[in-house]
A protein has these predicted regions:
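Positively charged n-region of N-terminal signal peptides that target proteins for export
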Residues: 1-4
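C-terminal motif of bacterial Sec signal peptides marking the signal peptidase cleavage site
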Residues: 18-20
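Bacterial signal peptide processing site
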Residues: 22-24
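Oxyanion-hole/transition-state-stabilizing segment in secreted/luminal serine hydrolases
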Residues: 211-212, 218-220, 225-226, 247, ...
Length: 425
């Protein structure tokens, strides 16, 4: 077994130590029964020893499986003639495969990658190549829209690409076996809080699902070969139940919580003209569907951070949206999704605008969403932000942000869907 690095047998411990399953908090760590590498290889069907475009592989929380499927990474140059080390969520006890981001290209062990002390190593001459600095950074700094500060604003920075399609050819996925437990933040199951949704699932009835978000909800950031996070969530509900899901995606790229409130109140002059037509179209869809919705996901915050909106105002606006849907259907279950972290390394590059993209702490928004969870019934917080914070202790920010701005990679979109689905079931 040339790719085995370590073999350990952990005892069976199926109950995680919880840090407040209610009150909107995440769990601290999760423990699963860990088998030896040999046991995993012997007991797992062959088709499950490879990374596939599979709804269960994509939406089962990574911390609940010993095989880490399709963990994504961006390979970058280190500025000194080499490449930055690949960061994995766990030490890799056995690497099953490494593929291109689209899963179409399978790379060869020994030639394209090695495994040393649990780490994935890319040797010289590998077909796994890093994004050249000449493509990651832009030569025309004067006319560039964004400046990237590798040290989160501590240096002058360099002009950087914000085109995800420039970066996707240098994104890869690795499927491997871990033999260590996870100690990071995880999402608790809160299906019991979502009384209407859970009853519909139990009765095997059809589900009407609304998703109210921004460009992340529209699917910005993904490469196009796979379902976006909203579509994955719908498919994940269907895979976990005998219910068919009718999805209405009411997301509006570029919108924030205040603009959604203004949209509903008809204050169109207070909405960015560049998004107004799309916003009006999505409002019509919400008006048509709100009275029939069984579950509504409200997922905002990234653009509020860019607007430097206070947590108190953000809470007020989200509360308005909750009331809007509850007035139409008092029984509707509502999921509040905290926003993924956006880049804290990038700022505007205009003479009249040098602002950072990330101005307000998104963690503060997660806290007020937890307060709303306690103030209403039949509601649950899916705390994507806190779950992702533990991921970022292991991974590069560029592994989860597709375009150096605020949009999720395919890999991060799967983490989003995993958190939403874990929360509602």
């Amino acid at each position: 077994m040339k790719k085995i690095l370590s073999v350990c047998l952990a005892g069976c411990a199926l109950c995680a130590a919880l840090a407040g399953c209610d009150g909107g908090e995440t769990q601290s760590g999760t423990q699963i029964e860990l088998k030896t590498v040999e046991e995993v290889l012997e007991q797992t069907p062959a088709e499950d020893l490879v990374g596939r475009n599979d709804i269960w592989q994509f939406t089962t929380p990574f911390y609940e499986t010993q095989i880490q499927y399709n963990e994504g990474f961006l390979l970058r140059e280190d500025g000194q003639g080499g490449t930055l080390p690949v960061r994995l969520m766990f030490p890799a006890a056995y690497v099953l495969e490494v593929r291109s981001n689209d899963l179409k290209t399978l790379y060869e062990y020994g030639k394209d990658y090695l495994v040393e002390d649990g780490q994935l190593v890319i040797p010289e001459g590998s077909a796994i190549v890093p994004v050249p600095d000449s493509e990651f950074f832009l030569s025309d700094a004067e006319n560039a829209e964004w400046i990237y500060n590798a040290n989160a604003g501590e240096d002058e920075g360099r002009a950087v690409t914000t085109d995800r399609f420039v970066l996707y050819p240098y994104r890869y996925v690795v499927t491997y076996i871990r033999t260590e437990q996870y100690s990071g933040k995880t999402a608790p199951s809160k299906g019991g809080q979502l009384t209407h949704f859970s009853q519909k699932i139990a009765d095997k009835e059809g589900i009407t699902m609304l998703y109210v978000g921004d460009s992340i909800g529209e699917g910005a950031g993904v490469s196009g070969e796979f379902l976006n996070l909203v579509e994955m969530t719908r498919s994940g509900i269907e895979a976990r139940s005998e219910s068919k899901v009718e999805l209405s995606n009411c997301s509006v790229g570029g919108i924030d919580s205040l603009e959604f409130m203004n949209l509903i109140n008809g204050l169109y002059d207070k909405i960015n003209p560049g998004i107004l037509d799309n916003a009006k179209q999505k409002l019509r869809l919400m008006e048509q569907k709100k009275g029939f919705a069984d579950i509504v996901f409200i997922a905002l915050g990234a653009n509020d951070s860019a607007a430097d909106r206070s947590a108190d105002l953000f809470k007020l606006h989200i509360g308005f949206l909750i009331d809007y849907f509850r007035e139409a259907n008092p029984d509707v279950s509502i999921v509040l999704a905290s926003s993924m972290e956006i880049s804290n390394k990038i700022r505007k590059n205009r003479e009249d605008d040098k602002r950072d993209l990330r101005l307000h702490d998104l963690g503060e928004y997660a806290k007020v969403l937890a307060e709303l969870e306690q103030e209403y019934t039949n509601i649950a917080l899916a705390d994507v932000h806190t779950v992702q914070s533990s991921v970022l202790e292991k991974k590069y920010l560029e592994d989860v942000i597709a375009d150096n701005l605020n949009h999720p990679t395919n890999y991060m979109s799967r983490l989003y869907a995993q958190t939403l689905l874990k929360t509602i079931f």
